Amino acid sequence: MPKMKTHRGAAKRLRVTASGKVKRFRAYKSHLLASKTPKQKRRLRHPALVDSTDRRRVARLLPYEA
């Protein structure tokens, strides 16, 4: 069977932590920021974890990650 390919778009956007959880950046932080409050923008700075319901889908995109 041939090697499975890593989805390069997902590999650039997602990181697998040591405990096996998947870290992602938050959406809504690239433009149209004038209408958002400073509190909203501050909370968007911090990364989030991919939900457990999406973990299997992410595992298919990143077959060689932990």
UniProtKB/Swiss-Prot annotation:
Superkingdom as given in the UniProt entry? Bacteria
| Pfam family membership, one | Ribosomal_L35p
Q: Does the keyword tRNA processing apply?
A: no
Keyword line: Ribonucleoprotein, Ribosomal protein
SUPFAM superfamilies under this entry?
Answer: L35p-like
UniProt record, GO biological process: translation
A single GO CC term for this protein reads:
cytosolic large ribosomal subunit
The keyword Ribosomal protein appears for this protein? yes
One GO term in the molecular function aspect is: structural constituent of ribosome
**Which PANTHER family has this protein been placed in?**
54S RIBOSOMAL PROTEIN BL35M (PTHR33343), LARGE RIBOSOMAL SUBUNIT PROTEIN BL35M (PTHR33343:SF1)
**Can you tell me which family this protein belongs to?**
Belongs to the bacterial ribosomal protein bL35 family.
Query: Which protein are we looking at?
Result: Large ribosomal subunit protein bL35
Taxonomic source organism = Moorella thermoacetica (strain ATCC 39073 / JCM 9320)
